[in-house]
Amino acid sequence: MTPGIRAPFLLTLLLALVTDPNSVALSQDTSSSSTLNTTPVHSGSSAPATSSAVDSATTPGHSGSSAPPTSSAVNSATTPGHSGSSAPPTSSAVNSATTPVHSGSSAPVTSSAVNSATTPVHSGSSAPPTSSAVNSATTPVHSGSSAPVTSSAVNSATTPVHSGSSAPVTSSAVDSATTPVHSGSSAPPTSSAVNSATTPVHSGSSAPVTSSAVNSATTPVHSGSSAPVTSSAVNSATTPVHSGSSAPPTSSVVNSATTPVHSGSSAPPTSSAVNLATTPVHSGSSTPATNSTTDSATTPVPPGSSMQTTEAISGSANTPIHNGSLVPTTSSALVPTTSAAHSGASAMTNSSESDLATTPIDSGTSISTTKAPATTPVHNGSLVPTTSSVLGSATTLIHNDTSTMATTTPVGNGTQSSVPSRHPVTPTPPAVSSNSTIALSTYYSTALSPAFSSHAAPQVSVGVSFFLLSFHIWNHQFNSSLEDPSSNYYQELKRNVSGLFLQVFSRAFLGISTIEFRSGSVVVDSTVIFREGAVNASEVKSQLLQHEQEAEEYNLAISKINVGEMQFPSSAQSWPGVPGWGIALLVLVCILVALAIVYLIALAVCQCRRKNYGQLDIFPIQDSYHPMSEYPTYHTHGRYVPPGSTKRSPYEEVSAGNGSSLSYTNPVVATTSANL
């Protein structure tokens, strides 16, 4: 030990012995400059303190807490250790502040910034904070809590941890907001923005908060809740989580709105727009909300409701959900109006137009609205799928558990008439009305569109009857203009005839198919269409004769009426049917053809199998077994000889003796004897 170091050490030891003779102190002070301050050690504590910074913040340790602070900045503040703490301070800077250690506490503090804030540790807590920024905020830890705090920003806000809580806080921005943790909670917040909002965690809650924006809003977590919050925008709104709720919101916009979650709810909202609206979730509700617009409206979800909201526009409407309702809302237009769902309602709204109307849903309702619908409120459990493709569509109100799908077809009452034309046209279905009938004619055919009144149901198909009607008009003279359908005389006369038929036959009359005029005064030849079964030929003639006065009103003096009904062959009669014997013959032919096909298949299979298998010769020529043959007596079994083989079996080998005698040789025995 050099004399320059030994002298201050001995001086410190003497001062400790003089101050408290009953205590045993060990103090090592290392100084590399002049004008060192006093470093007293009390009550048997060991306090090697290291100070290398000027005016660093105070880091006290109280009540058996473990707080190893390290100071490496200029003008470091006091670092006392109390209640049996152990604080080895080391001083390596000029004008370092006093570092007392009291009552066996351990408080190593590390400070690497100028004018850093105080980091106290109380009541047996473990708080190794590290400060690497200028004017960082206070990070106190109380009541046996564990709070490793890292501060790397200027003027960061306070991050206190109380009552046995664990709060590792990381601050890397200027003027970040406070992040307190209370009552055994775990709150590792991270702040990397300027003036970030407060992120407190209370009552055993877990709240890892990450802030990377300027002036972000508060994100408190209360009563055992879990609230990991990430803020990456300026002035983001508050995201509190209360009563055991889980709320990991992420904010990446400027001045985003509040997203609170209460009473065991789960609310991970994501905000990526400016000035987003509030999205609160109450009473165990689940609310994943994504906001990507500016000035979006409020989307609250109270008691146990589930809501997914996606907004990609500016100024979207409110979508509140109450009492366990499910409302996924998608908005892609400017300034849509409110879409509320109440009391267990399900409301899916897709809007792609501007100025959408209000769509509230109450009491378990389900509604789907697409593209600029007008107001469609549904109350008391009704189901109303409404689709609108225009702006400002009409209102559809449905109450009392009704289910309604409406299709509007504007139809007006009254009659429909067309001006007679002299050009032939194609006939179309006639018009039907409950209040009046329509009868128009052309030279060849008149097309009448059906018009249904509000009191008559539309008919898809109407049976019709055609009548050939001819009569004479003796108060008119025939001229060449009646042969031209475009002439005024032709049009006037045809219009009068049609009006007469309409007045006489009323609703039974459907129209005139063809009409022509010829000479004889004026002879009218027409094909008239009536409703099927309404009239017959005799009734048509009698009614025309009875309404001669009505004919005079149309300037028609009719006579010589002839009516004949046209008979059209039906579809069944147009194609003659097959007689029964023909059908029977056809079935028989089909059966015979099927049997022939089966027989041919079986025959082919038999031929193939016969070619694959060999022939079985029961008495072959070279067989050795023939009861009455000239072969030797002992040859009792035949041997199989493959075709084309001249080698005989060794059991059939015969050796000649004196010329006529035959002997049988057993090759196995012969081989065995030779081997022996």
From Swiss-Prot:
Family annotation (SMART domains): SEA
Extracellular side: 26-582
Cited Gene3D superfamilies: 6.10.140.600
Modified residues (Phosphotyrosine): 625, 634, 640, 651, 664
Membrane topology: Single-pass type I membrane protein
Secretion signal span: 1-25
Region span, Interaction with P53: 614-650
Intervals holding Sequence repeats: 40-59, 60-79, 80-99, 100-119, 120-139, 140-159, 160-179, 180-199, 200-219, 220-239, 240-259, 260-279, 280-299
Superkingdom of the source species: Eukaryota
Modified residues (Phosphoserine): 649
Skewed-composition ranges (Polar residues): 404-420
Short sequence motif named Interaction with GRB2, residue ranges: 625-628
PROSITE patterns referenced in this protein's UniProt entry, alphabetically: SEA
Motif Interaction with SRC and ESR1 positions after renumbering to this chain: 651-654
Lipidation (S-palmitoyl cysteine): 606, 608
Glycosylation sites: 43, 45-46, 50-52, 56, 58-59, 291, 323, 350, 380, 400, 413, 435, 479, 496, 536
Pfam families: SEA
Spans annotated as Disordered: 25-387, 404-434, 636-659
Sites of Phosphothreonine modification: 646
Regions crossing the membrane: 583-603
Domain SEA per the UniProt entry, residue ranges: 463-570
Role summary: The alpha subunit has cell adhesive properties. Can act both as an adhesion and an anti-adhesion protein. May provide a protective layer on epithelial cells against bacterial and enzyme attack.
The name this protein goes by in its record: Mucin-1
Organism expressing this protein natively: Mesocricetus auratus
